[in-house]
A protein has these predicted regions:
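Metalloprotease/metallohydrolase-associated module, dominated by Zn2+-dependent proteases
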Residues: 2-53, 108-130
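Hydrophobic alpha-helical transmembrane segments
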Residues: 59-69
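Small-residue-rich helix-interface/hinge motifs
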Residues: 68-120
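Membrane-interface helix-loop junction between the first two transmembrane segments
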Residues: 52-58, 89-91
């Protein structure tokens, strides 16, 4: 059997190599999309639970609506807080690249060695403002 016809993980489409990183702008769009969907899901679940509680009057529905409200509040506050940090860093022209796989709340890195104290303060203040 020739080398070209041998089946290996690389030729099967499964590679053990590190995936190619997306450009910063594409990772920003991916993070915005993921966070937008998380916001939409949180608000939708809370609204559905609240509508159920209001129309049924069940204590279970009211309890679930309350739990959904706290969950939605936490998700919304976290996302706005992190985007505030990101906005503060970018306004100050900080070296703040997007993370390789922006799927969680944290969407960018801040390099303390490459940034000034003023850039750090701008990034820091952005979180509570968001």
């Amino acid at each position: 059997m020739s080398e070209a016809s041998q089946t290996t993980p690389e030729t099967d489409g499964v590679s053990s190599l590190k995936p190619i990183s997306l450009p910063d702008a594409q990772r920003l769009k991916l993070a915005a999309r993921n966070h937008g969907l998380a916001l939409l899901a949180a608000i939708t679940l809370w609204a559905a639970a609240d509508a159920w509680a209001m129309t049924s009057g069940l204590n279970l529905a009211t309890g679930l609506s309350l739990l959904n409200a706290f969950a939605a509040m936490t998700i919304i506050a976290t996302i706005f807080h992190e985007w505030g940090h990101f906005t503060g860093a970018r306004i100050a022209k900080s070296y703040s690249p997007m993370v390789t796989n922006p799927t969680g709340a944290f969407i960018f890195g801040f390099n303390f060695a490459k940034n000034t104290r003023q850039q750090f303060l701008s990034m820091s203040i952005g979180g509570p403002v968001g």
